[in-house]
Amino acid sequence: MDLAIMIEGQNGLNWQRWQRLARAVEDLGFAGLYRSDHYTNAEPPDLDSLELWVSLTWLASHTQRLEFGPLVSPVSFRQPTMTARMAAAVDDLSGGRLTLGLGAGWQEREHTNYGWDLLDIARRFQRFEEGLTIIAHLLRSDTPFDFDGEYYKVREAVLLPRPARPGGPPILIGGSGPKRTLPLAARWADEWNAVFIPPARFRELNARLNELLEVQGRAPGSVRRSLMHGIVFGRDEAEVRRKLGNRSRASLEARGILIGTAHEIVEQLGRYAEAGVQRLMLQWLDLDDLDRLEALAHGVLRQLQ
């Protein structure tokens, strides 16, 4: 299992922070850097939120090794043909390091504030599958494509120039829902990303995904398994307690949140690796705390190597 960093772009991300974080994450040896795609927070206050694709374009041309991408980008924000075009271009610019994370959308406030239709859950996922169909075809096939859906329609659509990477950037589908998300992942995804679940639940969903992949005629190894999760890390026990504040350690641990010093974090990561997690994206909420990020890298990454 390898480790990557995930940040919430709507929590004050600006150019200075993004550039500083990207350089630090690469220099410290993490496998990747991922970010959310939100206009604003689910609840006030509204903070800086650097635009997704502009920020990823900078990352593609100013890093050498990091894998990166949205975790995840709602199809409700952009027409799927534009998403496919931008993803292919940014992936080419990076030399093939983008993972295209996609989701149905969930945050009502930003959709209302900025004029996007969130839709009810059933229609939201219908739109998501239509978007996936178009994006996947444009990235993976050079045959002109017609599609006549309820939400999207295209005629003789083809993506040019063709992606340098055969099939374009891998598609990641994020979410832990067994009824809607997992079947979509089994059909369309190159990577499935679960969100905030403990090891036992990941193991259950991982097994269910294998069953769904078999129905689709796909090998289990064709889909990478990853998890985005929270972390409360301290260089010593006193710092762990300070970072926890008034939150209940027991309730967080019940959700599988990683809590502790470097040695404790490594032990907890081992349980996720045993459950089938191949990459874990650590949600790093303090965009300015690079000293603690460095301590995490030095204390944890070296023990995983």
Describe each region flagged by the PLM:
Residues 1-305:
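Active-site-adjacent structural elements that line small-molecule/cofactor binding pockets in enzymes
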